[in-house]
Amino acid sequence: MFTIACLITFLWLCFGYSLSFSPCLENGGTKEVFGDAGRLWLRGMMKNTVHALAPTIPEALFCAYQLTFAIITAALICGSFADRMKYHSMIIFIMFWHLLVYCPLAHSNWHFHGWLYQLGCLDFAGGNVVHICSGASTADNH
């Protein structure tokens, strides 16, 4: 599990936060599903910047808070891999799963431009992103 925590932390800080929560440009074609590259490698994030979803705290704190959701969701899935998948296969799967499943779902649910958010989807305490995403991915693994 520590490997998963380290892997997700690296992916989140490099790519995941930008794909999930970067301020979308109006000319972006996929702003309903993915964020843009505005925060790749946390570019443009200063100690006094804030995110529109959490305007009362620094954006770095918001990024760290959302990182905990990303780690927990990946850890929930790894519980279903016991004796079913080799270790290196699990690492590769989680890497692609995080970037292609978790990040688009987090953006769609929690970002102002996300298509589920625009439909009025309410996600209290991460139920849609964390539990539905990890549960469906776990069920698919069996």
Set out the residue ranges of the language-model regions.
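Hydrophobic alpha-helical transmembrane bundles of multi-pass membrane proteins
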Residues: 1-142
